[in-house]
């Protein structure tokens, strides 16, 4: 009867059967320890959680496995030698710890050999043409060799070869007198004649500054006074002219009136 399926009613929790009996029951859940007691191992002999299988490794006391039992596949590497890729099989031997070291040693040796193939060494240090193409050459060693490649003209003097001697430090400064160093065969430029009063006022003010300032102040005051007097005189003349013009206009008006009255008197007779 244990193999028959158990019927389950709706609304009730379902519990799987325990052991060989077909009775339903709660699952085997470990109970919490009673208060006041330290927690201990939880049902270490439970069949639902079997202990993990131990995998004996190389660090165990059994020692390394035999050569006959070694079933690890060979390791394939790509090694670059002089631009060509070739496959190289590396077999592990002498345990798991020795295999990576052997692979690394072979890899480093292959990489070093490949690096040595790409280097360009100078066969003759005296030949500057070939030594310039070297990669690992310091600048202190290459500088005199590069300077030796520059072909100097034997006709040039030592002063002309050196730019510092050819162009002195003060060559950019303006020369005061161009007549001394003027090149021969070229006439010097004709300068305009110097004015006689050039810089006279500046020199006077620099020598007698306060006196010149006072003198100029008095001159300005006198000029203002004369201008004021002239303006006053002009105003007086304008007033006189206006008076004369008004008198003339009045006289003309009176003459016209007298002429009209005399003409009317004659008409009445």
Swiss-Prot record:
The chain crosses the membrane at residues 247-267. Changing residue 49 to F: No effect on tyrosine phosphorylation and viral ability to transform human T-cell. It is found in: Host cell membrane. Residues 1-12 have a biased composition (Basic and acidic residues). Residues 91-101, 114-127 have a biased composition (Polar residues). The keyword Ribosomal protein does not apply. Residues 1-246 are cytoplasmic. Residues 268-269 are extracellular. Residues 27-41 have a biased composition (Pro residues). Residues 158-167 are annotated as: CSKH/LBD2. Residues 186-195 are annotated as: SH3B/LBD1. Residues 61-74 have a biased composition (Low complexity). The keyword Flavoprotein does not apply. Changing residue 171 to F: No effect on tyrosine phosphorylationand viral ability to transform human T-cell. It is a single-pass membrane protein. Residues 1-127 are annotated as: Disordered. The SH3B/LBD1 (SH3-binding) region binds LCK SH3 domain and CSKH (C-terminal Src-related kinase homology) region binds the kinase domains of LCK. Both motif are required to activate LCK. Homodimer. Binds SH3 domain of host LYN, HCK, LCK, SRC, FYN or YES. When tyrosine-phosphorylated, binds to the SH2 domain of host LCK, SRC, or FYN. This is Protein tio.
């Amino acid at each position: 009867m244990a193999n028959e399926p158990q019927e389950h009613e709706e609304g009730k929790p379902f519990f799987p059967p325990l052991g060989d009996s077909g009775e339903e029951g709660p699952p085997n859940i470990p109970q919490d320890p009673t208060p006041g007691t330290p927690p201990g191992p939880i049902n270490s002999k439970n069949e639902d959680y079997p202990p993990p299988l131990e995998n004996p490794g190389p660090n165990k006391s059994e020692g390394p496995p035999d050569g006959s039992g070694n079933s690890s596949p060979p390791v394939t590497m790509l090694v670059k030698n002089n631009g060509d890729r070739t496959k190289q099989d590396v077999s592990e031997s002498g345990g798991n710890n020795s295999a990576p070291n052997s692979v690394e040693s072979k890899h480093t040796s292959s990489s070093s050999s490949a690096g040595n193939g790409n280097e360009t060494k100078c066969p003759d240090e005296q030949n500057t043409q070939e030594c310039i193409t070297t990669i690992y050459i310091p600048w202190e060693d290459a500088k005199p060799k590069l300077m030796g490649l520059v072909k100097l003209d034997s006709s040039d003097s030592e002063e002309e070869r050196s730019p510092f001697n050819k162009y002195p430090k003060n060559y950019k400064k303006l020369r005061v007198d161009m007549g001394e160093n003027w090149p021969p065969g070229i006439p010097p430029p004709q300068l305009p004649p110097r004015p006689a009063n050039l810089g006279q006022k500046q020199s006077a003010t620099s020598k007698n500054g306060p006196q010149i300032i006072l003198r100029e102040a008095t001159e300005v005051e006198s000029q203002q006074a004369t201008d004021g007097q002239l303006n006053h005189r002009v105003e007086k003349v304008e007033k006189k002219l206006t008076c004369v013009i008004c008198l003339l206009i009045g006289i003309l008006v009176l003459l016209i009136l007298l002429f009209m009255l005399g003409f009317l008197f004659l008409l009445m007779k």
